[in-house]
Amino acid sequence: MTLRGADILARSLARGGARCVFTLSGNHIVPVFDAAIDAHLRIVHVRHEGAATHMADAWGRLTRDPGIALFTGGPGHANGVGPLMTALAAESPLVMLSGHVPLDQVGLDGFQELRQADMAAPAVKASWTAKSAAALGEDVARAMQVARSGRPGPVHLSIPSDLFEAPVEGADGAIPAAEAFRAVPAPLADRTAEAVIADLARAKRPLVLTGPTMANDRGRELRVSLAEVTGIPVLFMESPRGIADPSLGAVADVLAQADLVVLLGKKLDFTLKFGRPPTFDAACRFVQIDPDPEAIGRAARALGAPGRIVLTAVADTLPAAECLVRVGARRAPRRDGWTEDVQSAIRYRPAEWTTLATREGAVHPVAVGRAIRDYFARDPGAVYVSDGGEYSQWVQASVDASTRITNGPGGAIGGGVPFAIAASLARPDARVVLSTGDGSFGYHLAEYETAGRERASFVAVVGNDGCWNAEYQIQLRTYGRYRAIGCELSPAVRYDLAVSALGGYGELVTKGSDLAVALERAVQSGRPACLNVMVERVAAPAISHRAAAPTTSSG
């Protein structure tokens, strides 16, 4: 059998479990579009390459299979690279494929020639350029395997355009077997799990901290199970705000009391203040289970003092959690006040939030959060997506969603609309609700046309405060309001009308009392929708029993 390189590529993607390819067409990759037909791959054609990378990221987080992004070379590749950092920090399996100057033109200033693999390398787990049409199946298998293995993350492969049309004789064996695409396992030994459980049992105030790999449905189930079988608090962290993540309530108030912390796939990084005092007590000990030996080494350097890390293991996060649940179930769960202290801190929200949510005048962001929270109480299978800075922190702190996608530890904004589209495609039977600021919403507004064309349905609840508010708040704190500069946006922009013009459903909301019914109308429209909510300009909440959260306008 003779196949083109493009056919080998497309069929290998399908063999590896891919169903969708998020892409923007270009000269280099036209043969792949053709090959996708016979490989039964869905082409999701977007309006900007960055949006496609975000969509592949969200797809990977929700399905645990690598999301596939495909671009033409040169500027198309460059446009798609930026969101890779978000996917890397969020531990999202993703494969980015880029067209490339033909092999015989490399180094000769061919059309749109760039050192693409070098450009992508800092933001991915692996990056290389294909050399042979016959080996494209092996390249794809390697890319998908690396994306899935260890700490999941993005991988880049550039493919010279001449390889796509190159005929490969005897191509029957050019598409690898399914095993070649699977993750390389790194299990946690039962003996090690027993030692971890024993350490937890001996500790007086233990904690288990988990990271972004535990964000998906299976991760959430395991977090709940581990907490139940051990009786020990299990915290999930994925915010760039770290211990100040409003979703974690006042947890920062109690961390310094912990005497043992198990890092289950959670990096000891800036989000944990590197494990140092005063965030953690100087005598607090750490156990680290991580798929990356280098992450374990960095933790030891961050802590400095010898003896603070008492046990380490190189193991995959989800299987390690399964092992800990199984081994932990052999002991009776602990019952003491420490776990309730931690859970109480996480649940804590200042009493005045109720007043903020119901008062007249400008809509406070917490009112939006309460409206979305109430919707999720009625529809617990819905997917929550969060994007933006200050405004969405209030919403995140209010909404308890079983499935959520955020901008992750990388902290970049602008991916919300593409995330929501991919969530709708990955979960076609689920409702999708996005909270996003007006600044972040503007990044990929044109993708509403993509959403309508692809029959993706979601509701974006835009907090319109006419500002790049995160940076504005920094200016206020640092320089004062009279030296705030360059962060204003126009609050008069009718994002709702723009969405309507793109084929979606749009509605302007100016009163908090109208939020619930407006949200229901938007959901029932069945279209990609936008609620343009005029919100008060306030800083994100800083939740603590020791200090009141900011509640009044900062503008």
Protein language model annotation of sequence segments:
Residues M1-R334, S457-A460, T478:
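N-terminal alpha/beta PP-like core and its mobile active-site loop of ThDP/TPP-dependent enzymes
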Residues R4, A134, S158, A171-D172, ...:
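Phosphate/pyrophosphate-binding active-site segments
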Residues A6-L9, A14, L24-I37, Q343-D429:
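Active-site diphosphate/adenylate-binding microenvironment
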Residues V32, A166-E169, I296-R298, R347-R349, ...:
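Short acidic/His/Gly/Ser-rich catalytic and metal-binding motifs that mark active-site loops
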Residues D57, A117-D118, V224, R370, ...:
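Active-site phosphate/pyrophosphate- and oxyanion-stabilizing loops and adjacent acidic/basic residues
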Residues G60, A147, A227, R373-A377, ...:
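N-terminal cationic-hydrophobic initiation segments that often serve targeting/anchoring roles
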Residues L84-T86, M144-Q145, R276, Y375-A377, ...:
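Short amphipathic alpha-helices and their capping/turn segments at secondary-structure boundaries
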Residues L97, Q105-Q112, L255, V314, ...:
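Thiamine diphosphate
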